[in-house]
Amino acid sequence: MNYSENILGTIGNTPLVKLNKVVQGIDALVLAKVETFNPGNSTKDRMALKMVEDAEADGRLKPGGTIIEGTSGNTGMGLALAAIVKGYKCIFVITDKQSKEKMDILRAVGAKVIVCPTDVEPTDPRSYYSVSKRLGTEIPNSWYVNQYDNPSNALAHYEQTGPEIWEQTNGKVTHFVVGVGTGGTISGVAKYLKEKNPNIKIWGIDTYGSVFKKYHETGIFDENEIYSYITEGIGEDILPKNVDFSLIDGFTKVTDKDAAVYTRKIALEEGIFVGNSAGSCIKGLHFKPDDVVVVLFHDSGSRYVGKMFNDDWMRERGFLDEEITTAGDIVKENTSKNLIIVRTEELVSHAIDRMRQYKISQIPVIDVNGFVGSVDETDLFQSYVTDKNVADKPIKDVMGKPYPIVKLSTPIEEVSKLFNRETQAVLVDLENGKHHIITKSDIIGSIK
C-alpha cells in the first residue's frame, strides 16, 4: 500500500505546469512551480516543517511547547500543521493588511492569532516583528521561530525545492523567478541551482514600498523607499538574513494593481487559482525564445477571495480596467439604490439632516410634477451667511435650478460638459421611472 503516515508526508514534489495564454508574447518556455499542492496550500509548508524539525533536534523546541511566529499567514499554516501532528501549541502574530481568510484559516487549525498594525516601524513595540519576539521571551516553554533570520528557512529550499526544479526540467532551467519576502525561497533555490549551473539567472520580484530592489542595486538601505502597499507575501521594510543578495541577479518591481490584475488573469486564462504574489511574478517576465523559465507560485487564491478576486474590492482601489464611456457605466453599480430627494414643502433642516446621514453634498428637489430644483452645500452656505435662521425656512426658498437629466446612453464627454458653477450634479434617467445622480466626484473617479 502507498500512503503517508501523516499529512506532513505530503509536503513537496509539487508539479511544474506550462503556462500558455497568460504568457502570450513571451517566446520562452514558462513553467509554474505550483506550490498550492502542498497540504497547507503554500510553499511555506516546506520551511515550516524544516524549522520545526531543526529546532526539535537542537533542543530549542521542547515537548508540549508553544510555537510563536510573526507571519503573513502562510508560514503560520505550515507551522500549525506541524504543531498538530507533533503536539505543540501555536501563537501567530499577523498584520492587519493580511486577508481575513488567512486569519480565519489559522484559527481553524487551532492557532491563537494576534493582529498588529501594518503602518508602524519594525522596531515599534506594536509591530508584528516586535510583538512576536516579545512573546517568545515572556511565554514559558516557547520557541520564537523568526523565519526572516532562521537559516532552516533557506535550507529547506536548498534541500527540496531547488533539486525538484533541477530534476523536473532535466537541468535545462535557465531562469528562476520568485517573489521575495523572507528570502528563504529565492536564496535556497538559487544556491542549489547555481551550484549546478552558475549561468542560471535568479530574478526576484519586489513591490513598490519595499527596500529590496534599490538595496540590491546600490547597497543603500533607503527608508524613503518604504511606504504602505497592498500586495501580500513579498517585499519588506527590513533586510532579512535569509536574503542572500549575492545569489540574486536582479529585481523587478511590480505595482499593487498589476499584481492583482495578473493574479486574476492566471485564474481566468490558465485555471490556476493562486495568490497575488504569483501575479507579480508573471507581470515581471521578459525573456528570450530559448529560455526555460521557472516561476514559483507561492500560495492559493483561496486566501484572497475577499480581495483581488472580489470585484468590489478591485473597483474601490481602481484596479478594474472597466471601460467607462456613458452615464450608464458610471451609475450601473448603484441603480438599485434609491435617489435621495427633498420635497419643496420640507424645511432646509431636513435637507441638512439627509446630507449628514447619507454623506452627500447635492440633493434634487421635487414636487408633485417632478424635479423642480436642487440644493447643495454651496446654496446652504450662502443662505446661512445672509440668514442665520435658514434651517427653519422652506427648501423652495433656497433651492437652485433643477439638475439636467441625461439618458443612460449619454457619452461621458457630454455629461462632463453639463457641469459648471451652477450645476453641481446631473441626473440619469434609468428608464424605469427612477433616476440616479452623478456628481463631479463620480466623473473624477471614472478617470483611469
Regions found by a protein language model. Name each.
Residues 83, 165, 355, 363, ...:
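Terminal peptide-recognition signature
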Residues 340-359, 365-367, 384, 405-424, ...:
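The conserved cystathionine-beta-synthase
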